Amino acid sequence: MRWLAGFAWLVAAGALAFVAETKVSQLPPEARDTLTLIKAGGPYRYPQDGKTFHNREKVLPKRERGYYREFTVKTPGARDRGARRIVAGRGGEFYYTEDHYNTFRRIRE
C-alpha cells in the first residue's frame, strides 16, 4: 500500500503525467514536416520556434525550466500560427498538440 501512496504523490507533484501516444505516420503531414525540421536543427518558419515551453498547463511531465522547446506546426488556412505545436524535450522526446496545449500525444518513432 505504501507504493500506492508514493505513486499518488508522484502524480500529484507532476513528476508523472499520463499522455496518449501517436506514431509519426499518424501525424498530419505538416507535423511530420515540422518534426523533420526540428531533428535537422532548422531552419524554422516562425521566430517563436525553439523558444522555451513552460508547461504551465502541467500536462507534460514536470521538468526544470528550459527542458521543453516549442515549434509551430503549420495549420492550412490559418492566418496566424494556429493551434498546432510540437514540443521537444531535451531527452529526445516529442509531443504533439493540435489544441494549443490542452492535450498532448507523445510521438513514437
PLM region descriptions:
Residues 3, 18, 22-24, 101, ...:
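Extended, aromatic/histidine-rich regions of cofactor-dependent oxidoreductases associated
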Residues 8-13, 27-30, 71:
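Generic signature of intrinsically disordered, low-complexity, basic-rich segments
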Residues 17-61:
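N-terminal secretory signal peptides
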Residues 42-109:
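Functional cores of ribonucleases/endoribonucleases
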